[in-house]
Amino acid sequence: MLAEFIDPAILGFILIGVMLFSIFVGFPISFTLIFLGFVFGYLGFGKLVFYLMTLQFSMVMTEQTLAAVPLFVFMGIMMEQAGLMERLFSAFQLMLAKVRGSLYYAVLFVSVVFAAATGIVGASVTILGIMAAKSMNRSGYNVRLAAGTITAGGTLGILIPPSIMLVVMGPIMEIPVTDLFAAAIIPGILLATLYAAYTTIRCWIDPSLGPVLPPELRATSMKEVWIEFFLGLVPPAALVFAALGSILFGFATPTEAAGCGAMGSLLLALAYKKLTLKKLQDALVKTLEISALIMVLVAASNFFGAVFSRLGTPMLLTDFLLGLEMNKYFILALIMVMIFLLGWPLEWVPIVMIIIPIILPLVEALGFNLTWFAILVAVNLQTAWLSPPVALSAYFLKGVVPEWDLKDIYYGMMQFMVIQVIGLILIIVFPKIALWLPAYLYGQ
């Protein structure tokens, strides 16, 4: 074994370097983690790596909380198939037709509801772009501010429950998913409020950025408005609040609530006569693809993280940084910057499953609340989704609104990236923003 000639902890640093290089050059993440974990584990502590691999994969397969992932994914896809978000957007558009910037408010409100229904960023940005861009163009809205609003609203799916990322993050950080859901609600509403305040101020200073809607886009009667509003808001809101509320108030586990939500979304699609055999098949295939990707990554990263921890590198790194006697908030700032930079080229999945377990011992040693830290990570990754040059949200939006210049989309996103940073700083300075609701609900 190589451990006879080199400190296993140093071997762990080499493992991280090789892993990052392999991912950045394009090797499949799951297979890279399994292969490197096996090779470096065998070099570091021999045949024990076989038992470690079996144990970690078995733990993932028997983790009941992760069963909520495919159910929440299916719930979101069926809500999309039923066309409920389009109806809700139309209702808000009609209600606020005479208000400056009304379409910005409609996008943000729908994005909050849709985030609570799906938890998938790509789907949120795509649907919001399809729904809103045409009306915004016809009404003469500013492309940059419109693009920023759509992409920022779409990224709320990372944070607002039932966020798929929070469902996965809970078992990894050994935090109850209910705590993470409760902690994410107020920060999510805070960010949406900051977005709305920003668009309001911009439209007040320059009314041409969000003019009132032209007559052809307004309702012919208030009856039409209220029918659209009721049919668009009440069913999805009732479904979301039933699923989320049952989790927060302890009536059901996340998996049970996800199962009820999935069945409810299927019934809604049937009630609205939007469900066909082809759409159901597509929804099931999409659910399978997304869920399989996440589950294999969870298992692979669990094994990789276990090997890395067994090599002793996390403790060596923690002892080294604590020995420097730096201010703990300075170390937190360094961690946030690192996660932000990694969020440019990488999806949230490898960051949450690989990087977070590596730095978790350090965060615990510094005495930070793990629930609060998890919300900081979520908001930080949301910020990275809005940050050029990679900015994955920009490409989702460009794909459905090709007439918008990518430069304008980038410029619009950067405005909201600054708002995200302000929100992140507020949560750091005032931890109660994230921790008050879990404490109130669960007495922590």
Predicted feature locations:
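Generic alpha-helical transmembrane segments of integral inner-membrane proteins
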Residues: 13-24, 35-42, 70, 74-78, ...
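Membrane-interfacial helix-loop connectors
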Residues: 40, 127-139, 169-182, 311, ...
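Membrane-interfacial loop-to-helix junctions in multi-pass transporters
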Residues: 6-12, 61-67, 94-106, 122, ...
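Hydrophobic transmembrane alpha-helices that form the pore/transport pathway of multi-pass ion
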Residues: 93-168, 348-377
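Long, contiguous bundles of hydrophobic transmembrane helices that form the permeation core
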Residues: 4, 172, 179-290, 395-415, ...
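Hydrophobic transmembrane alpha-helices of multi-pass solute/ion transporters
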Residues: 2-69, 90-91, 223-248, 255-296, ...
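Short amphipathic alpha-helical coupling elements at transmembrane boundaries
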Residues: 55-59, 87-98, 127-138, 147, ...
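Transmembrane alpha-helix interface/packing and boundary motifs in multi-pass membrane proteins
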Residues: 19-29, 75-80, 110-122, 150-158, ...
